[in-house]
Amino acid sequence: MNCKRKMLLLIQGLSLLLLFDHYSRKNQEEELELSDWFKPRGRPDVITTTSWLAPVVWEGTFSRKMLEKHYRRQNFTTGLAVFATGRLADPYLELFLNSANKYFLTGYRVIFYIMMDTFIKLPQIKWEPLRQFKVFIVTESRWWDNDVVRMKSLAKHIIWDIQGEVDFLFSMTVTQIFQNNVGVEVLGELVAQLHGWWYFKDRASFPYERRPKSAAYIPFGQGDFYYDGAFVGGTPQEVLNLAEEYLNGVIHDLGLRLNSSYEKHLNKYFFLRKPTKLLSPEYNWDADFYPPPQVQYVKVAQQSKRRH
């Protein structure tokens, strides 16, 4: 009897091992390799791969078909956080939401997190399928710098609400407007946006923080790219790490009576913690400037605040 029981346990153990091996192989088969979708030779006119081998996404460098084939099988949700307070809420929010509803991750589940300082009537938008929105009222004191308030509020809501609801999270400024499809090519663990203006300049001229005592300090001769703070993303945990590091940097600088911008702190963060994917200037082009030949396809335009 004892022998039979041992044999039964052995058979059960082998069955579990085979089952585990089957699902392990299946998951490996479903894993998307960079070479499956990224075609850097498609754009010889621009930088398509960083020195740490992260892809720089331009139109013409990715296979939308392969990406769609992979992500359509995945059960994921993406969050898009936008901060619309004060005078920026009325003239920009409706344009932002309408364009994002139309062009951002069309056909995939998206939760729009709208962060406002007062609860006003939201614009009437006919939401596409798989879309929903949530409004968070910003309670942080407004005497702080606007970026500090934004990132402090974002970090708080990632911890309290967002991290349990989405797999990817992006933070954008309300002055942006989507002009063409922004799809699953932007998804990644830690996604940075190249600055449209500074991408075409020499690194020596980048406006990094040069005061050694600042937490945002990057020495002369160092640095990779200049990143734009208007569009950042990744997993909720990575976005939370970025926000917390920025806030810690601000506190450090205040103690030394220094004041460095959010974008400079962001560039220091990406200098130390290399992004796993970079978005080309096509994903945030300044609408006041005519795009150069390299920017063939403007996906997102940054509107000028001077117009309002």
UniProtKB/Swiss-Prot annotation:
InterPro entries assigned to the protein according to its UniProt record, in alphabetical order: Glyco_trans_6, Nucleotide-diphossugar_trans
Signal peptide: none
Biological processes annotated in GO: carbohydrate metabolic process; lipid glycosylation
Cofactor(s) the protein needs: Mn(2+)
Main location class: membrane
Cofactor note: Binds 1 Mn(2+) ion per subunit.
Class of enzymatic activity (EC top level): transferase
Membrane-traversing stretches: 7-23
GO CC annotations, alphabetized: Golgi apparatus; membrane; vesicle
Protein location: Membrane
Protein encoded by which gene: GLT6D1
Lumenal topological domain residue ranges: 24-308
Pfam families: Glyco_transf_6 (PF03414)
The EC number(s) this enzyme carries: 2.4.1.-
Membrane topology label: Single-pass type II membrane protein
Family stated for the protein in its record: Belongs to the glycosyltransferase 6 family.
Keyword annotations from UniProtKB, A to Z: Glycoprotein, Glycosyltransferase, Membrane, Signal-anchor, Transferase, Transmembrane, Transmembrane helix
MF GO annotations: glycosyltransferase activity; hexosyltransferase activity
Active-site residue list: 263
Residues listed as glycosylation sites in the UniProt record: 75
Topological region Cytoplasmic: 1-6
Name of the featured protein: Glycosyltransferase 6 domain-containing protein 1
SUPFAM superfamilies reported for this sequence: Nucleotide-diphospho-sugar transferases
